[in-house]
Amino acid sequence: MIIAGSDGPISLSIPVVGGRSVKVSYKEVQIDYTGNWQRDHFRTLCTAYGNSAFFMFYRDELEILYKESPVFLYEWNLSCLHWLSKKLKIEKIINIKNDGLSIPESFDDDLYKPQSLGNDSDNKLFRYHQVFQDKTGFLPNLSILDPLFNLGPDVKSYLLNASTKL
């Protein structure tokens, strides 16, 4: 995931057992807990978004999420997805079945992809205030956490409005 920091974009990734070169199915990718990525990610989010308008309303729940220690990466991703679904008030649920992901037919995944809002030069009307915007300029295509922490409950209507203008 990519978030906005004071010096520009920050990439946060979860280490996996065997690294990127491991050749296993998605549901078999295990998280590597030899480092303290959870603490580092959470601290980075606190530093980057501590002064945003809505971070304080999500901080405690996010901290609980970062204290979870699922074995598999898909479990972490699913926990995050369910948390975000609640925050965005998305009622369609994505479930894991033995044969893979189950996504409702009417689920519009393009709406929630960063590139769906286009690039910065094409979509100046989709801007919102970012914490370090005065220093870095507007940074497009960041994690959903960026508009969530900056727009709060209005993030869903922002995404819906932006998607109808593409």
Q: Where do the PLM segments sit?
A:
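Residues lining hydrophobic/aromatic ligand-binding pockets adjacent to catalytic sites
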Residues: 1-166
